[in-house]
Amino acid sequence: MRIGRRTFIAGASATLGLVFAKPAFAREKIKIRDLYKTQAEFSDQAKSFAASREVINVPGFMAPPLKADASFFVLTQRPMAVCPFCETSADWPSDIVFVRTSKIVDAVAFNRPIMTTGILELGEAKDEETGFVSLVRLVDAQFEIL
């Protein structure tokens, strides 16, 4: 059986399309360090994710819990000994993200990497429940230990 040139090209194109296509379930990922362009300005990628309100993945580590039975945690690249957002956004480090979940969070050891999934929000905001002030948040979030 011979395959014509048009049939071959159509088949090859379809196959390449499947190989290079992103799966529908794949989510965009951004590292904490890529949220900022400068210390005081968010990156274009972070602004785009926040504007689209699409669900994204952010890898990192869970900081030790600030209180028991909480539905939030701090995602960071390193452990932190103090509450970084209890006072004002002026003290907000550029390597943490406030994460709000829909259920109580079971604490994870500070040195276990996790992947957090949620909707990115940017800009100063005060959490109604806790009173914490944040510049970067993941809301409607979930996480898994890697």
PLM region descriptions:
Residues 1-3, 7-26:
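N-terminal export signals
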Residues 25-146:
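OB-fold and OB-like single-stranded nucleic-acid-recognition modules
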